[in-house]
């Protein structure tokens, strides 16, 4: 009786694995899904394990580091998912660096390349609607992995790779600040700011509630008053009701701000 019961359980688990793996398909620059439906912890953990295994397999002979950076954007539960995958990355024999706050994907890519670590996993859905979330994989050069890589990740998932998570072990780094300091090492930001003031140019930057919010202000050490103004820098998981993509149809607040600035200038 126990034999047949276990056999039935195995069959059901196999069906579940097939269902899970069939919903995981990589698209442009990563895997994405709707939060709570196809993007859930069960699917994400499988993708993370397969991604880590493939990063080790393909690049361990090209980089000595066993460190993986985990970054995340400002979407609903992004930080929670980022912290939740740490035990699975650790279980693959890799060390974790966790971003201290929300961060852009380019910042993660720069950090990986400059510190010569194995790669990065970024919890983000880029420009997709608010109810989406996803995972981007970056190789040791900070670049997006290619289609051959993601096909291998999908193959590993279909094989039913399951790794038991272990106790979280990670270090926290300010990835955004690292990027800002790198830019400052190349450019004289005070000179740029002074030139903008001299030319009487005011710059408006629409963060669209995204991960770049307040970065420009930090880049100029907070000395941007009357020269650079941020728009929609506060956190909003709904992104003002539109996808966070800089298309003309989604930039009403920026357009209105510019029109108001023009009207004020004409009055003076």
Label each residue range with its predicted role.
Residues 30-31, 128, 207:
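Conformational gate/switch positions in structured elements
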Residues 43, 47, 81, 104, ...:
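Catalytic-loop motifs flanking and including active-site residues across diverse enzymes
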Residues 2-21, 133-266:
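Gly/Ser/Thr-enriched, mixed-charge loops and adjacent short helices
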Residues 28-34, 72, 120, 135, ...:
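Gly/Ser/Thr-rich helix-start
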Residues 34, 98, 140:
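Short, flexible active-site loop motifs that bind/organize anionic cofactors or intermediates
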Residues 40, 74-75, 101, 142, ...:
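Short beta->alpha junction loops/turns
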Residues 1-92, 169-203:
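An N-terminal, well-structured beta->alpha segment
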Residues 3-5, 61, 68-132, 219-268:
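N-terminal small/polar loop signature for handling phosphorylated ligands or for N-terminal nucleophile
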């Amino acid at each position: 009786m126990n034999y047949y019961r276990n056999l039935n359980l195995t069959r059901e688990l196999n069906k579940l694995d097939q269902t899970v793996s069939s919903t995981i398909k990589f698209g442009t620059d990563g895997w994405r899904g709707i939060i709570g439906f196809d993007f859930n912890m069960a699917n994400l953990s499988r993708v993370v394990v397969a991604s880590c295994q493939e990063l080790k397999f393909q690049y361990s002979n090209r980089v000595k580091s066993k460190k993986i950076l985990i970054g995340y954007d400002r979407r609903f539960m992004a930080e929670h998912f980022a912290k939740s995958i740490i035990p699975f990355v650790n279980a693959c024999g890799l060390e974790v660096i966790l971003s201290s706050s929300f961060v852009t994907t380019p910042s993660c890519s720069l950090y990986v390349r400059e510190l010569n670590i194995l790669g990065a996993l970024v919890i983000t859905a880029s420009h997709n609607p608010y109810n989406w979330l996803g995972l981007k994989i970056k190789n040791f050069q900070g670049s997006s992995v290619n289609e051959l890589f993601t096909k291998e990740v999908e193959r590993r998932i279909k094989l039913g790779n399951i790794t038991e998570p272990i106790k979280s072990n990670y270090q926290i780094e300010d990835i955004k600040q690292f990027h800002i300091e790198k830019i400052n090492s190349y450019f004289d930001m005070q000179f740029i700011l002074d030139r903008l003031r001299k030319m009487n140019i005011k710059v408006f930057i629409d963060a669209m509630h995204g991960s770049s919010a307040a970065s420009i202000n930090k880049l100029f050490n907070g000395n941007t008053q009357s020269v650079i103004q941020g728009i929609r820098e506060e956190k909003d998981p709904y992104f003002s009701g539109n996808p966070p993509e800089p298309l003309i149809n989604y930039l009403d607040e920026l357009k209105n701000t510019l029109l108001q600035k023009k009207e004020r200038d004409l009055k003076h």
